[in-house]
Protein backbone atom coordinates (compact mmCIF):
# COMPACT_ATOMS: atom_id res chain seq x y z
CA UNK A 1 0.00 0.00 0.00
CA UNK A 2 1.41 3.40 -0.98
CA UNK A 3 1.69 6.46 1.22
CA UNK A 4 -1.10 8.12 -0.77
CA UNK A 5 -3.34 5.09 -0.27
CA UNK A 6 -2.69 5.24 3.45
CA UNK A 7 -3.49 8.95 3.50
CA UNK A 8 -6.80 8.30 1.80
CA UNK A 9 -7.63 5.52 4.23
CA UNK A 10 -6.77 7.71 7.21
CA UNK A 11 -8.93 10.53 5.82
CA UNK A 12 -11.90 8.20 5.41
CA UNK A 13 -11.52 6.92 8.97
CA UNK A 14 -11.30 10.48 10.29
CA UNK A 15 -14.55 11.33 8.50
CA UNK A 16 -16.24 8.28 10.01
CA UNK A 17 -15.00 9.28 13.45
CA UNK A 18 -16.18 12.89 13.04
CA UNK A 19 -19.63 11.86 11.88
CA UNK A 20 -19.98 9.63 14.93
CA UNK A 21 -18.32 11.79 17.59
CA UNK A 22 -19.26 15.32 16.51
CA UNK A 23 -22.92 14.90 15.61
CA UNK A 24 -25.19 17.34 17.52
CA UNK A 25 -26.88 15.85 20.56
CA UNK A 26 -30.66 16.25 21.08
CA UNK A 27 -31.60 19.26 23.20
CA UNK A 28 -33.11 18.43 26.59
CA UNK A 29 -34.56 21.46 28.41
CA UNK A 30 -33.00 21.93 31.83
CA UNK A 31 -30.34 19.30 31.17
CA UNK A 32 -28.55 20.48 28.02
CA UNK A 33 -26.24 23.46 28.44
CA UNK A 34 -26.96 26.58 26.35
CA UNK A 35 -23.45 28.05 26.04
CA UNK A 36 -22.80 31.71 25.18
CA UNK A 37 -20.36 30.67 22.45
CA UNK A 38 -18.68 27.65 20.96
CA UNK A 39 -17.08 26.02 17.97
CA UNK A 40 -18.88 24.17 15.18
CA UNK A 41 -16.49 21.74 13.52
CA UNK A 42 -16.94 18.56 11.52
CA UNK A 43 -15.21 16.02 9.34
CA UNK A 44 -13.54 18.50 6.95
CA UNK A 45 -11.77 20.35 9.75
CA UNK A 46 -10.39 17.14 11.25
CA UNK A 47 -9.43 15.75 7.85
CA UNK A 48 -7.45 18.84 6.88
CA UNK A 49 -5.74 19.04 10.27
CA UNK A 50 -4.66 15.40 9.95
CA UNK A 51 -3.53 16.04 6.37
CA UNK A 52 -1.41 18.96 7.57
CA UNK A 53 0.14 16.84 10.30
CA UNK A 54 0.95 14.10 7.77
CA UNK A 55 2.74 16.70 5.64
CA UNK A 56 5.22 17.09 8.49
CA UNK A 57 5.55 20.80 7.65
CA UNK A 58 4.92 22.16 11.11
CA UNK A 59 5.22 25.93 10.69
CA UNK A 60 3.23 28.05 8.23
CA UNK A 61 3.06 26.37 4.84
CA UNK A 62 0.64 25.54 2.04
CA UNK A 63 -2.46 25.57 4.21
CA UNK A 64 -1.56 28.95 5.67
CA UNK A 65 -0.94 30.36 2.20
CA UNK A 66 -4.34 29.13 1.05
CA UNK A 67 -6.06 30.41 4.18
CA UNK A 68 -4.59 33.92 3.91
CA UNK A 69 -5.58 34.12 0.24
CA UNK A 70 -9.13 32.90 0.84
CA UNK A 71 -9.68 35.14 3.87
CA UNK A 72 -8.45 38.13 1.88
CA UNK A 73 -10.95 37.31 -0.87
CA UNK A 74 -13.78 37.04 1.66
CA UNK A 75 -12.97 40.35 3.36
CA UNK A 76 -11.91 42.16 0.20
CA UNK A 77 -8.29 43.01 0.99
CA UNK A 78 -5.04 42.12 -0.80
CA UNK A 79 -2.89 41.53 2.29
CA UNK A 80 -3.64 39.10 5.15
CA UNK A 81 -1.14 37.87 7.74
CA UNK A 82 -2.06 35.15 10.21
CA UNK A 83 -0.88 35.34 13.79
CA UNK A 84 -1.29 33.57 17.12
CA UNK A 85 -4.47 35.28 18.38
CA UNK A 86 -6.74 38.27 17.98
CA UNK A 87 -4.83 39.92 20.81
CA UNK A 88 -1.57 39.34 18.92
CA UNK A 89 -3.23 40.78 15.82
CA UNK A 90 -4.11 43.93 17.76
CA UNK A 91 -0.56 44.14 19.12
CA UNK A 92 0.91 43.85 15.63
CA UNK A 93 -1.55 46.33 14.12
CA UNK A 94 -0.81 49.07 16.63
CA UNK A 95 2.92 48.34 16.92
CA UNK A 96 3.30 48.52 13.14
CA UNK A 97 2.32 52.18 13.34
CA UNK A 98 5.39 52.89 15.50
CA UNK A 99 7.76 51.86 12.69
CA UNK A 100 10.37 54.47 11.77
CA UNK A 101 9.70 53.48 8.16
CA UNK A 102 6.50 55.58 8.44
CA UNK A 103 8.47 58.78 8.98
CA UNK A 104 6.53 61.66 10.52
CA UNK A 105 3.36 59.57 10.82
CA UNK A 106 5.02 56.99 13.07
CA UNK A 107 3.50 56.83 16.54
CA UNK A 108 5.86 57.87 19.33
CA UNK A 109 5.70 57.47 23.13
CA UNK A 110 3.31 60.05 24.57
CA UNK A 111 1.10 60.17 21.49
CA UNK A 112 -2.62 59.59 22.10
CA UNK A 113 -4.92 56.86 20.80
CA UNK A 114 -8.68 57.48 20.99
CA UNK A 115 -10.70 54.45 22.09
CA UNK A 116 -13.38 53.24 24.51
CA UNK A 117 -13.23 51.66 27.97
CA UNK A 118 -16.26 49.39 27.42
CA UNK A 119 -14.65 46.45 25.71
CA UNK A 120 -11.90 43.86 25.74
CA UNK A 121 -8.53 44.83 27.29
CA UNK A 122 -6.41 43.85 24.31
CA UNK A 123 -8.02 46.47 22.11
CA UNK A 124 -6.42 49.05 24.40
CA UNK A 125 -3.35 47.29 25.80
CA UNK A 126 -1.16 47.61 22.68
CA UNK A 127 -1.26 51.40 23.01
CA UNK A 128 -0.10 51.17 26.62
CA UNK A 129 2.56 48.59 25.75
CA UNK A 130 3.98 51.01 23.18
CA UNK A 131 4.13 53.97 25.57
CA UNK A 132 1.05 55.66 24.11
CA UNK A 133 -1.81 57.29 26.01
CA UNK A 134 -5.31 55.83 25.62
CA UNK A 135 -8.01 58.50 25.52
CA UNK A 136 -11.46 57.23 26.45
CA UNK A 137 -14.86 58.49 25.33
CA UNK A 138 -18.25 57.06 26.19
CA UNK A 139 -20.34 54.57 24.25
CA UNK A 140 -23.93 54.37 23.10
CA UNK A 141 -26.58 51.98 24.37
CA UNK A 142 -28.14 49.93 22.75
CA UNK A 143 -25.46 49.66 20.01
CA UNK A 144 -22.67 49.34 22.64
CA UNK A 145 -20.29 51.16 20.31
CA UNK A 146 -18.36 54.41 20.57
CA UNK A 147 -20.53 57.53 20.61
CA UNK A 148 -19.02 59.08 17.49
CA UNK A 149 -20.39 62.53 18.37
CA UNK A 150 -17.89 62.66 21.25
CA UNK A 151 -14.73 61.88 19.30
CA UNK A 152 -13.79 65.33 17.99
CA UNK A 153 -13.80 66.75 21.51
CA UNK A 154 -11.09 64.20 22.35
CA UNK A 155 -8.75 65.24 19.53
CA UNK A 156 -5.64 67.21 20.51
CA UNK A 157 -2.30 67.89 18.86
CA UNK A 158 -1.12 64.63 20.47
CA UNK A 159 -3.86 62.52 18.85
CA UNK A 160 -2.39 60.17 16.26
CA UNK A 161 -4.75 57.18 15.99
CA UNK A 162 -8.20 55.75 16.67
CA UNK A 163 -8.40 52.08 17.65
CA UNK A 164 -11.81 50.63 18.48
CA UNK A 165 -13.72 47.36 18.19
CA UNK A 166 -17.02 46.55 16.54
CA UNK A 167 -18.74 45.48 19.73
CA UNK A 168 -20.11 41.92 19.64
CA UNK A 169 -20.18 42.15 15.84
CA UNK A 170 -22.15 45.41 15.66
CA UNK A 171 -20.30 47.92 13.47
CA UNK A 172 -19.50 51.31 14.95
CA UNK A 173 -20.40 54.46 13.00
CA UNK A 174 -17.71 54.03 10.36
CA UNK A 175 -18.70 56.96 8.15
CA UNK A 176 -18.29 59.44 11.01
CA UNK A 177 -15.18 57.82 12.48
CA UNK A 178 -13.57 57.67 9.04
CA UNK A 179 -14.46 61.34 8.45
CA UNK A 180 -12.77 62.37 11.70
CA UNK A 181 -9.71 60.21 10.99
CA UNK A 182 -9.34 61.85 7.58
CA UNK A 183 -9.92 65.36 8.92
CA UNK A 184 -7.21 65.08 11.58
CA UNK A 185 -4.86 62.70 9.71
CA UNK A 186 -5.32 59.92 12.27
CA UNK A 187 -4.58 56.26 11.73
CA UNK A 188 -7.65 54.04 12.07
CA UNK A 189 -7.43 50.45 13.33
CA UNK A 190 -10.62 48.37 13.26
CA UNK A 191 -10.70 45.55 15.81
CA UNK A 192 -12.97 43.06 14.03
CA UNK A 193 -12.21 40.14 16.35
CA UNK A 194 -15.92 39.77 17.11
CA UNK A 195 -17.19 40.95 13.72
CA UNK A 196 -16.07 38.71 10.86
CA UNK A 197 -18.69 39.08 8.12
CA UNK A 198 -20.26 42.30 9.40
CA UNK A 199 -20.88 44.93 6.74
CA UNK A 200 -21.40 48.69 6.86
CA UNK A 201 -23.03 50.34 3.86
CA UNK A 202 -22.56 46.99 2.12
CA UNK A 203 -18.79 46.93 2.69
CA UNK A 204 -16.96 44.54 4.99
CA UNK A 205 -15.80 46.01 8.27
CA UNK A 206 -12.04 46.11 8.57
CA UNK A 207 -11.72 47.64 5.11
CA UNK A 208 -12.54 51.22 6.15
CA UNK A 209 -9.49 51.65 8.35
CA UNK A 210 -5.77 51.41 7.68
CA UNK A 211 -5.53 48.02 9.41
CA UNK A 212 -8.09 45.45 10.56
CA UNK A 213 -7.80 42.49 12.91
CA UNK A 214 -9.75 39.30 13.51
CA UNK A 215 -9.65 36.39 16.00
CA UNK A 216 -10.03 32.64 15.50
CA UNK A 217 -10.42 31.57 19.12
CA UNK A 218 -13.09 28.81 19.43
CA UNK A 219 -15.73 31.31 20.56
CA UNK A 220 -15.43 33.36 17.38
CA UNK A 221 -17.07 33.22 13.97
CA UNK A 222 -14.57 30.70 12.64
CA UNK A 223 -11.85 28.95 14.58
CA UNK A 224 -8.45 27.34 14.31
CA UNK A 225 -8.17 26.78 18.07
CA UNK A 226 -5.97 29.76 18.81
CA UNK A 227 -5.13 32.21 16.06
CA UNK A 228 -5.88 35.56 14.49
CA UNK A 229 -5.06 37.69 11.48
CA UNK A 230 -4.08 41.23 10.56
CA UNK A 231 -5.17 42.63 7.21
CA UNK A 232 -4.63 45.80 5.22
CA UNK A 233 -4.89 47.31 1.76
CA UNK A 234 -1.44 48.89 2.12
CA UNK A 235 1.58 47.04 0.78
CA UNK A 236 3.85 49.21 2.93
CA UNK A 237 1.97 48.38 6.13
CA UNK A 238 1.86 44.69 5.19
CA UNK A 239 5.66 44.52 5.07
CA UNK A 240 5.97 46.32 8.41
CA UNK A 241 3.39 44.08 10.11
CA UNK A 242 5.13 41.01 8.71
CA UNK A 243 8.46 42.24 10.04
CA UNK A 244 7.11 42.74 13.56
CA UNK A 245 5.42 39.33 13.42
CA UNK A 246 8.58 37.56 12.20
CA UNK A 247 11.21 38.56 14.78
CA UNK A 248 11.55 42.11 13.42
CA UNK A 249 13.60 40.94 10.46
CA UNK A 250 13.97 43.06 7.37
CA UNK A 251 13.76 39.98 5.14
CA UNK A 252 10.31 38.90 4.00
CA UNK A 253 11.10 35.42 2.66
CA UNK A 254 8.54 32.74 3.46
CA UNK A 255 9.67 29.81 5.63
CA UNK A 256 11.93 27.53 3.58
CA UNK A 257 12.62 30.21 0.95
CA UNK A 258 15.76 32.28 0.42
CA UNK A 259 16.69 35.39 -1.55
CA UNK A 260 13.15 36.43 -2.56
CA UNK A 261 14.37 40.02 -2.90
CA UNK A 262 17.36 38.99 -5.05
CA UNK A 263 19.66 41.07 -2.81
CA UNK A 264 20.32 38.67 0.08
CA UNK A 265 24.06 39.37 0.10
CA UNK A 266 24.02 42.73 -1.67
CA UNK A 267 22.86 45.26 0.95
CA UNK A 268 24.29 47.32 3.77
CA UNK A 269 21.84 48.29 6.54
CA UNK A 270 22.48 49.90 9.92
CA UNK A 271 26.17 49.65 10.73
CA UNK A 272 26.40 46.03 9.60
CA UNK A 273 29.11 45.13 7.09
CA UNK A 274 28.34 45.23 3.39
CA UNK A 275 26.65 42.04 2.21
CA UNK A 276 25.53 40.90 5.67
CA UNK A 277 22.93 38.15 5.15
CA UNK A 278 19.57 39.91 4.74
CA UNK A 279 17.89 36.88 6.35
CA UNK A 280 19.51 37.91 9.64
CA UNK A 281 19.05 41.66 9.39
CA UNK A 282 16.48 43.20 11.77
CA UNK A 283 14.78 46.54 11.23
CA UNK A 284 12.25 46.35 14.10
CA UNK A 285 12.03 45.19 17.71
CA UNK A 286 9.87 42.25 16.76
CA UNK A 287 8.21 39.08 18.02
CA UNK A 288 7.60 35.54 16.81
CA UNK A 289 3.81 35.38 16.38
CA UNK A 290 3.24 32.87 13.58
CA UNK A 291 0.81 29.96 13.61
CA UNK A 292 1.24 26.31 12.63
CA UNK A 293 0.03 24.92 9.33
CA UNK A 294 -2.30 22.55 11.21
CA UNK A 295 -4.12 25.57 12.64
CA UNK A 296 -4.39 27.10 9.19
CA UNK A 297 -5.80 23.81 7.86
CA UNK A 298 -8.61 23.96 10.40
CA UNK A 299 -9.24 27.60 9.52
CA UNK A 300 -9.34 26.80 5.81
CA UNK A 301 -12.10 24.25 6.35
CA UNK A 302 -13.97 26.74 8.53
CA UNK A 303 -13.76 29.41 5.83
CA UNK A 304 -15.76 27.14 3.54
CA UNK A 305 -18.61 27.54 6.04
CA UNK A 306 -18.19 31.19 7.01
CA UNK A 307 -21.18 32.48 5.04
CA UNK A 308 -23.37 29.73 6.51
CA UNK A 309 -22.14 30.62 10.00
CA UNK A 310 -22.77 34.35 9.50
CA UNK A 311 -26.31 33.78 8.26
CA UNK A 312 -27.08 31.45 11.18
CA UNK A 313 -25.83 34.04 13.66
CA UNK A 314 -28.06 36.67 12.07
CA UNK A 315 -31.04 34.31 12.11
CA UNK A 316 -30.49 33.32 15.74
CA UNK A 317 -30.15 36.96 16.74
CA UNK A 318 -33.42 37.93 15.04
CA UNK A 319 -35.26 34.93 16.49
CA UNK A 320 -34.06 35.64 20.02
CA UNK A 321 -34.82 39.35 19.77
CA UNK A 322 -38.35 38.61 18.63
CA UNK A 323 -38.81 36.15 21.48
CA UNK A 324 -37.57 38.57 24.12
CA UNK A 325 -40.02 41.31 23.11
CA UNK A 326 -42.18 39.99 25.94
CA UNK A 327 -39.52 41.16 28.41
CA UNK A 328 -38.92 44.72 27.19
CA UNK A 329 -40.52 46.16 30.33
CA UNK A 330 -37.37 44.96 32.07
CA UNK A 331 -34.73 44.58 29.37
CA UNK A 332 -33.14 46.94 26.86
CA UNK A 333 -32.53 44.88 23.74
CA UNK A 334 -29.68 45.54 21.28
CA UNK A 335 -29.99 47.58 18.09
CA UNK A 336 -27.83 47.39 14.98
CA UNK A 337 -25.93 50.55 14.10
CA UNK A 338 -27.61 52.49 11.30
CA UNK A 339 -26.36 51.38 7.86
CA UNK A 340 -24.84 48.19 9.29
CA UNK A 341 -25.65 44.50 8.86
CA UNK A 342 -24.01 42.83 11.86
CA UNK A 343 -22.61 39.35 11.97
CA UNK A 344 -23.47 39.13 15.65
CA UNK A 345 -21.02 37.53 18.07
CA UNK A 346 -23.45 37.60 20.99
CA UNK A 347 -26.75 39.06 22.13
CA UNK A 348 -26.17 41.96 24.58
CA UNK A 349 -28.83 42.81 27.15
CA UNK A 350 -29.00 45.73 29.58
CA UNK A 351 -31.35 45.78 32.54
CA UNK A 352 -33.51 48.89 32.55
CA UNK A 353 -33.10 51.25 35.48
CA UNK A 354 -36.80 50.71 36.25
CA UNK A 355 -36.59 46.90 36.17
CA UNK A 356 -36.06 46.56 39.91
CA UNK A 357 -33.76 43.65 39.12
CA UNK A 358 -30.19 42.99 40.19
CA UNK A 359 -28.00 41.63 37.38
CA UNK A 360 -26.33 39.12 39.67
CA UNK A 361 -29.70 37.63 40.56
CA UNK A 362 -30.67 37.26 36.90
CA UNK A 363 -27.42 35.74 35.64
CA UNK A 364 -27.34 33.40 38.65
CA UNK A 365 -30.88 32.25 37.79
CA UNK A 366 -29.85 31.69 34.16
CA UNK A 367 -26.73 29.83 35.23
CA UNK A 368 -28.80 27.49 37.39
CA UNK A 369 -30.98 26.88 34.31
CA UNK A 370 -27.78 25.94 32.40
CA UNK A 371 -27.90 29.09 30.25
CA UNK A 372 -24.43 30.58 29.91
CA UNK A 373 -23.89 34.32 30.22
CA UNK A 374 -20.93 36.65 29.84
CA UNK A 375 -20.40 40.23 30.95
CA UNK A 376 -19.45 42.75 28.30
CA UNK A 377 -15.79 41.93 28.79
CA UNK A 378 -13.97 44.42 31.03
CA UNK A 379 -17.04 46.57 31.77
CA UNK A 380 -15.27 49.85 32.41
CA UNK A 381 -11.61 49.19 31.75
CA UNK A 382 -10.31 52.07 33.87
CA UNK A 383 -11.87 50.43 36.94
CA UNK A 384 -9.91 47.20 36.41
CA UNK A 385 -7.11 46.53 38.94
CA UNK A 386 -4.28 46.73 36.42
CA UNK A 387 -5.30 50.25 35.37
CA UNK A 388 -4.34 51.72 38.75
CA UNK A 389 -0.90 52.71 37.44
CA UNK A 390 -1.75 53.31 33.78
CA UNK A 391 -1.59 56.81 32.35
CA UNK A 392 -4.77 57.66 30.42
CA UNK A 393 -7.20 60.47 29.70
CA UNK A 394 -11.01 60.56 29.82
CA UNK A 395 -13.05 63.04 27.79
CA UNK A 396 -16.48 63.74 29.25
CA UNK A 397 -18.29 61.25 31.47
CA UNK A 398 -18.27 57.49 30.98
CA UNK A 399 -21.90 57.20 32.07
CA UNK A 400 -22.96 54.46 29.68
CA UNK A 401 -19.67 52.65 30.18
CA UNK A 402 -20.40 52.44 33.90
CA UNK A 403 -23.95 51.36 33.18
CA UNK A 404 -22.61 48.51 31.04
CA UNK A 405 -20.27 47.55 33.86
CA UNK A 406 -23.20 47.32 36.27
CA UNK A 407 -26.22 46.23 34.23
CA UNK A 408 -25.17 44.58 30.95
CA UNK A 409 -24.45 40.97 30.00
CA UNK A 410 -24.74 38.89 26.85
CA UNK A 411 -25.99 35.47 25.84
CA UNK A 412 -25.26 33.16 22.94
CA UNK A 413 -26.51 33.08 19.36
CA UNK A 414 -23.67 31.06 17.81
CA UNK A 415 -24.48 28.57 15.00
CA UNK A 416 -24.50 25.55 17.31
CA UNK A 417 -27.73 26.80 18.92
CA UNK A 418 -31.12 25.82 17.51
CA UNK A 419 -34.56 27.36 17.91
CA UNK A 420 -35.13 24.78 20.67
CA UNK A 421 -32.26 26.29 22.63
CA UNK A 422 -33.51 29.83 22.02
CA UNK A 423 -37.13 29.06 22.90
CA UNK A 424 -35.89 27.62 26.18
CA UNK A 425 -33.83 30.76 26.84
CA UNK A 426 -36.85 33.00 26.25
CA UNK A 427 -39.02 30.85 28.51
CA UNK A 428 -36.51 31.17 31.34
CA UNK A 429 -36.37 34.96 31.03
CA UNK A 430 -40.16 35.04 31.13
CA UNK A 431 -40.17 32.75 34.15
CA UNK A 432 -37.73 35.00 35.99
CA UNK A 433 -39.86 38.09 35.34
CA UNK A 434 -43.12 36.26 36.10
CA UNK A 435 -44.48 36.55 32.56
CA UNK A 436 -46.77 34.17 30.64
CA UNK A 437 -47.26 31.90 33.65
From Swiss-Prot:
<dbReference type="Pfam" id="PF01041">
    <property type="entry name" value="DegT_DnrJ_EryC1"/>
</dbReference>
<dbReference type="GO" id="GO:0008483">
    <property type="term" value="F:transaminase activity"/>
</dbReference>
<dbReference type="InterPro" id="IPR000653">
    <property type="entry name" value="DegT/StrS_aminotransferase"/>
</dbReference>
<dbReference type="InterPro" id="IPR015424">
    <property type="entry name" value="PyrdxlP-dep_Trfase"/>
</dbReference>
<dbReference type="InterPro" id="IPR015421">
    <property type="entry name" value="PyrdxlP-dep_Trfase_major"/>
</dbReference>
<dbReference type="GO" id="GO:0030170">
    <property type="term" value="F:pyridoxal phosphate binding"/>
</dbReference>
<dbReference type="GO" id="GO:0009243">
    <property type="term" value="P:O antigen biosynthetic process"/>
</dbReference>
<dbReference type="GO" id="GO:0000271">
    <property type="term" value="P:polysaccharide biosynthetic process"/>
</dbReference>
<protein>
    <recommendedName>
        <fullName>Lipopolysaccharide biosynthesis protein RfbH</fullName>
    </recommendedName>
</protein>
<keyword id="KW-0448">Lipopolysaccharide biosynthesis</keyword>
<comment type="pathway">
    <text>Bacterial outer membrane biogenesis; LPS O-antigen biosynthesis.</text>
</comment>
<comment type="similarity">
    <text>Belongs to the DegT/DnrJ/EryC1 family.</text>
</comment>
<keyword id="KW-0663">Pyridoxal phosphate</keyword>
<dbReference type="InterPro" id="IPR015422">
    <property type="entry name" value="PyrdxlP-dep_Trfase_small"/>
</dbReference>
